[in-house]
Amino acid sequence: MGIINAEKLKAIESAMSHIEKQFGKGSVMKLGDHNISNMDAISTGCLDLDIALGIGGVPKGRIIEIYGPESSGKTTIALHIAAESQKKGGAVGYIDAEHALDPSYAQKLGVDVDSLIISQPDTGEQGLEIAEALVRSGAIDVLVVDSVAALVPKAEIEGEMGDSHIGLQARLMSQALRKLAGTINKTNCVAIFINQLREKVGVMFGSPETTTGGRALKFYASVRLDIRRIDSIKQGDSIIGNRTRIKVMKNKVAPPFKQAEFDIMYNEGISRCGNIVDVGVKEEIVQKSGAWFSYGDIRLGQGRENAKLYLKENPEVALDIENQIREKYNLPPAELFKAAAPEGAKENISAKDDVAVDTKE
């Protein structure tokens, strides 16, 4: 690297000293004066998604956007991130603009509802003011806004049905993100904005889908996750979950456009054991021979559901497999978890009764 001459260095030092006097210590600095460490992240609770994000989860101090069609799992992902943060002693704020949070479902996903800070604002302005106050406190580790589409401007609420309010919500979001972005970074908070899809009228080529709230969130978000339900998971005639795919559409902290696939089981959330089996097979840590799954000398079971059930009943084996996968991708090791087997689960599910993924549209 070239060396800056003495006169330039003196001028820079003088300018920096003047800036610090005017704006305070820390307002300007040399990047090399501070330890550059790997970016801190909060796990998503899904091994495959942590790998796809490149840093082991969602980055701290950044804005995250999760969007997709209805009932695709957007809130489930946000609640899993909240639960993972709480496990590490983090505080979570939840702006429930849709007024639709189910506390019992959140509890099943591992969220400590007693310590969850929740607000159900009357207007979009109120919701974003509360969000800013929580972030500015410096005590919130994860803030979830559910959803951007439900942040209705005050003028629209007080107006008549049928009144035109073009661009009001976009202006509201643009102003809010300008104010929030710097504070979120300084307080090392993860701000998750859940968003809905709309369709643009008259689009002939390309996707007509767009997200609500204008373009500001697309620019300010460091990570954008497109979540889709791709299949139904059946046991007999009953649908017991969804097969879900997430595509990382934007990523400022790692290479984008990676994908993750996993099961979201009803009343359970993301199937951690199912994810370990899938990624383990892909990475050849778990061996699959016909319908049988094995890990070294340990036979996990015949059929994917038996393998999942074995890992639920033997969390030490699941942890060992997961940490081998994490080591391969330079991710921090996982801690021991205990997941009880589902109520009424048979000790050995035959391969014939294995849960099937319905590929019909």
Curated annotation (Swiss-Prot):
Similarity annotation: Belongs to the RecA family.
Keywords: ATP-binding, Cytoplasm, DNA damage, DNA recombination, DNA repair, DNA-binding, Nucleotide-binding, SOS response
UniProt: ATP binding residues: G68, P69, E70, S71, S72, G73, K74, T75
Gene name tied to this protein: recA
Biased composition (Basic and acidic residues): 344-361
SMART domains hit by this protein: AAA (SM00382)
GO CC entries: cytosol
Localization terms from the record: Cytoplasm
Gene3D superfamilies: P-loop containing nucleotide triphosphate hydrolases (3.40.50.300)
InterPro entries (UniProt xref): AAA+_ATPase, DNA_recomb/repair_RecA, DNA_recomb/repair_RecA_CS, P-loop_NTPase, RecA-like_C, RecA-like_N, RecA_ATP-bd, RecA_C_sf
Function: Can catalyze the hydrolysis of ATP in the presence of single-stranded DNA, the ATP-dependent uptake of single-stranded DNA by duplex DNA, and the ATP-dependent hybridization of homologous single-stranded DNAs. It interacts with LexA causing its activation and leading to its autocatalytic cleavage.
Region (Disordered): 342-361
GO terms classed as biological process: DNA recombination; DNA repair; SOS response
Organism name: Clostridium beijerinckii (strain ATCC 51743 / NCIMB 8052)
Name of the molecule in the record: Protein RecA
UniProt KW ATP-binding keyword: yes
GO molecular-function term, one example from the UniProt record: ATP hydrolysis activity
Listed CDD domains: RecA
Keyword Endoplasmic reticulum tagged: no
